[in-house]
């Protein structure tokens, strides 16, 4: 029976999901398919690389570090994002709290991330490259409007996947999963409301406003 796991995003709330994944690792349980959105998959790759507590270590050591996140990063012309992209997706995994690329590459299953195509407003699903030491796709799936630039993924303008498909369980079923574990970062009763900032989104992204009738998830 093919088993998949779906990891919802949610910025720092996603540390809950990493606890679930770490618990699965204690039983040496890895599914055949992993898909996530935004911070869900950004943290989820450490589950696939079998690095228990890695995400917790990052959170404890760097969550209050201005290099990690802060408006100062957004004002830098070489960054243009609330998160310090080079620090988060380069320095941390390659120097400070090393990511195990070899174990990640050896995983025999599928790993996908969700992004929102800014031309269509629809979700796109891409495999996470096993040897990308810049994690470009993970940067794109975390790219909230206003707080990140638009990322080019295979010639398509992409941003945060949670805008188009926040809980991609249907994608897991499409990929042949017969059993799907869904890890949420909101309470069971949570219902996402219409986005109050939609007029600002339309103004900020005028070229996409016809197609991009989306609800940006509240973080």
Task: Give the ranges of each region predicted by the language model.
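Patatin-like phospholipase
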Residues: 1-37, 45-219
């Amino acid at each position: 029976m093919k088993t998949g796991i779906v990891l919802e995003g949610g910025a720092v709330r996603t540390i809950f999901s990493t606890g679930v994944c770490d618990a699965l690792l204690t039983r040496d349980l890895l599914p055949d398919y992993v898909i996530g959105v935004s911070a869900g998959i950004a943290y989820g790759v450490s589950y696939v690389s079998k690095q228990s507590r890695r995400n917790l270590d990052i959170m404890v050591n760097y969550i209050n570090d201005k290099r990690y996140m802060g408006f100062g990063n957004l004002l830098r012309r070489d960054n243009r994002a609330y998160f310090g992209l080079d620090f988060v997706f380069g320095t941390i995994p390659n120097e400070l709290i090393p990511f195990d690329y070899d174990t990640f590459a050896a995983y025999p299953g599928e790993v996908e991330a969700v992004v929102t195509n800014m031309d269509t407003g629809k979700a796109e699903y891409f495999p996470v490259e096993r040897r990308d030491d810049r994690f470009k796709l993970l940067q794109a799936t975390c790219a909230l409007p206003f707080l990140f630039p638009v990322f080019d993924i295979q010639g398509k303008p992409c941003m945060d996947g949670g805008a188009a498909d926040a809980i991609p369980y249907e994608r897991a079923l499409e990929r042949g999963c017969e059993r799907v574990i869904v890890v949420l970062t909101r309470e069971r009763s949570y219902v996402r409301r219409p986005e109050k900032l939609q007029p600002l989104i339309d103004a900020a992204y005028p070229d996409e406003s016809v197609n991009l009738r989306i609800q940006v998830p509240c973080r």
